[in-house]
Amino acid sequence: MSGAPIRVVGTLGTAQTLAWASSYYLPAMLADPIARDLGVSAPTVYAAFSIAMVASALVGPWAGQAIDRRGGRIVLVSTSLLFASGLGMLAAAQGLWTMVAAWLVMGAAMGSGLYEAAFSSLVRLYGHHARGAITGITLIAGFASTVGWPLSSWMEAQFGWRGACLGWAGLHLVVGLPLNAWLPKAAAVSKPEIPSASNNAHVQSSPPASEPKQQVYATALLAFVFAATWFISTAMATHLPRMLEATGATLTAAVAVGALIGPAQVAGRLLEFGFLRQVHPLLSARLAALAHPAGVAVLLTGGPAMAPVFAILHGAGNGILTIAKGTLPLALFGPQGYGARQGWLMMPARVAQAASPFLFGLALDSWGANALWLSGGIGSAAFGALVVLRARSTAN
């Protein structure tokens, strides 16, 4: 695992599976019963979830800086407690505002306990050798929806949605917390650094505007790439069946095609682990960024018969890009100050993720299948940004 023990990858990957299954993938199974019980609409529940995503964006830089200073173990252990608290609050919610408060706590947990925190923890432990471990984490946690959706559905059927939330909270306390506590302890540092041309620019409590212009430019490009690709990923996750129906596919076919995306994501990550890890992450990111626009072109040209090709291209590209969000900043900027930088890089992405379901839904309502030109255009812009980023990196 490129310098990281398999035990660490397995431990953190399992904890990440639990974290994703009980947060990001929770509304898909519980939004409707929560809405019925609290007397609100399902879109209101999703709006509260979007607020949680914005909260996670605000927490991310702080969590990253804490990991840079103290290592990931203490942050991730604290996050297990936050997840349990948020889920417990959600289980006890009696109305709109108590539900929103619960999702705000969940947002704080997500901002300090999902992939960005896990990647930062690995980089803090293993530095430049963390790439293989980052890939391994995503391979394991890529099954979060496969585990989370059936388990949430079963717990809701057996114990109600409140019991399901309490069940997830209990799992964080008896499984997630011990797993995170099992991570190696990183040596504390007094003040983490973000590498610069002189290698002495310190992490600030604001975006790294004091860095040399080249690094500021590269950081802005990466932030755009991550925001663009998160927008696409969330839009497809939310609207894929309806979008495929707009191209002429039947509902049955759309659901069947949607089932291809998960395996395609895993296949993409295996491709990264087996072959693309030998090349610079910029190359694998560029190939992955092209996958969605290529799938859009195939689907709009060939019609619903080409929907499986679209799903495979989109899924594989998305799987590789998930890894690139961890490996690309490491390759471009190095391990110093990685956590804080990752927090700032992902802040626009989390906001885009929160807005994506609503904005792409509007486009789909207004334009039908032609809304794919929007996602394809955004994906092409992300590819272009990666090309420019490579050119500038090579030039210097």
Task: Show the residue positions of the predicted features.
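Extracytoplasmic
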Residues: 7-42, 59-63, 149, 234-241
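Helix-to-loop junctions at the C-terminal end of transmembrane segments
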Residues: 59-71, 268-281, 364-365
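C-terminal transmembrane helical hairpin of 12-TM major facilitator-type secondary transporters
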Residues: 259-265, 279-328
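Conserved MFS/SLC helix-loop-helix module at the cytosolic interface between two early adjacent transmembrane helices
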Residues: 58-96
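Helix-loop-helix hairpin linking two adjacent transmembrane segments in secondary transporters
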Residues: 137-188
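A late C-terminal transmembrane helix in Major Facilitator Superfamily
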Residues: 145, 335-367
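Intracellular juxtamembrane helix-capping segments at the cytosolic ends
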Residues: 112-126, 320-333
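Extracytoplasmic gate region of multi-pass secondary transporters
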Residues: 27-31, 215-267
